[in-house]
Amino acid sequence: MRSPSAAWLLGAAILLAASLSCSGTIQGTNRSSKGRSLIGKVDGTSHVTGKGVTVETVFSVDEFSASVLTGKLTTVFLPIVYTIVFVVGLPSNGMALWVFLFRTKKKHPAVIYMANLALADLLSVIWFPLKIAYHIHGNNWIYGEALCNVLIGFFYGNMYCSILFMTCLSVQRYWVIVNPMGHSRKKANIAIGISLAIWLLILLVTIPLYVVKQTIFIPALNITTCHDVLPEQLLVGDMFNYFLSLAIGVFLFPAFLTASAYVLMIRMLRSSAMDENSEKKRKRAIKLIVTVLAMYLICFTPSNLLLVVHYFLIKSQGQSHVYALYIVALCLSTLNSCIDPFVYYFVSHDFRDHAKNALLCRSVRTVKQMQVSLTSKKHSRKSSSYSSSSTTVKTSY
């Protein structure tokens, strides 16, 4: 199985490169300085705007934060990873969504969940050029407050959307094994209802990201950051409670459901008698389990754990020593947009066929003609075999 292994290798390479970048950043700063997180401290100085001299609330950052904002970790490494995710994720998820919507006739629950997962990835990836440009230009945001809020909202919304839809997909696969004779139309209606509920939930839980002011001007660096620097009071108060609630409610609980579903699935597969066809299904189910667990370990677990640790250190100590690892983990979480199409490949046999036909530029009409031709050939072989056996029987008497 290549996709999980490739994901592990890519994740390991990214972590190695990130650790080197982080060490270089830390060595270039004063180790005795405090406030090792991107906390914006109020600096009540006046600055000249286009309409004259006005006094506004501006912010300053400590030496470590300045080194992170100007270092290669954020200005070189992050845009490289985001570029890879954009180049791979945009066409693969676009094709996946097209296959699910226009090529797949039977809308099973798994197809519905995977289509929503592809849509979530696509809605996140299309904003990546702005994020890439932001980091390349020294973490300087020039696109306005509204676009910054949209970018951050879609960034976190995609991560938690992916977690919830992967959980639904995992539970659904277990339910198919336990109850294979269920009514497909009823299941599809339930899946549509659950998908709509997930989108509504994500919209509601990401509202604070759209409301809170995400851009802050740093006069000392002459840059405007997008989400990288926030006021200290906001970080230790509302943002801590907000991200802690997200980590528990939208990551930890779904992760528990996913793990439970796969443990029960493995038990069911081991206890049931296996013929040749069932053995193939069992192997495909195991591939799905390994792929999903790899996604959780590489993409979701580090970012959510470090997110809680980062904000806890800010709240308890007024500083965070893990910010560099935290932003690398957030960067790794975007790899799910590249891995998800491989999950579709393992889960759905129809998706594999439709994707191959799409890549070979075969129209729906051409595929139907090929299927009819193949069916007629099989039927003719069976007929010739039957007539041959009948002739043999007659001559033996």
Swiss-Prot record:
Example of a GO MF term: signaling receptor binding
Disulfide bonds, paired cysteine numbers: C148-C226
Ranges in the topological domain labelled Extracellular: 37-71, 138-149, 212-235, 318-323
Post-translational modification note: A proteolytic cleavage generates a new N-terminus that functions as a tethered ligand. Activating serine proteases include trypsin, mast cell tryptase, coagulation factors VII and Xa, myeloblastin/PRTN3 and membrane-type serine protease 1/ST14. Subsequent cleavage by serine proteases, including neutrophil elastase and cathepsin G, leads to receptor deactivation. At least in part, implicated proteases are also shown to activate the receptor; the glycosylation status of the receptor is thought to contribute to the difference. N-glycosylated and sialylated.
Lipid modification (S-palmitoyl cysteine), residues: C361
Secretion signal span: 1-25
UniProt-listed GO biological process terms: blood coagulation; cell-cell junction maintenance; defense response to virus; establishment of endothelial barrier; G protein-coupled receptor signaling pathway; inflammatory response; innate immune response; leukocyte migration
Residues carrying a glycan: N30, N222
Subcellular location: Cell membrane
Main location (coarse class): membrane
Site (Cleavage): R36, S37
Consequence of substituting N222Q: No defect in ligand-mediated receptor activation
Subunit structure: Interacts with TLR4, COPS5 and TMED2. Interacts with GNAQ, GNA11, GNA12, GNA13 and GNA14.
UniProt protein name: Proteinase-activated receptor 2
Gene for this chain: F2RL1
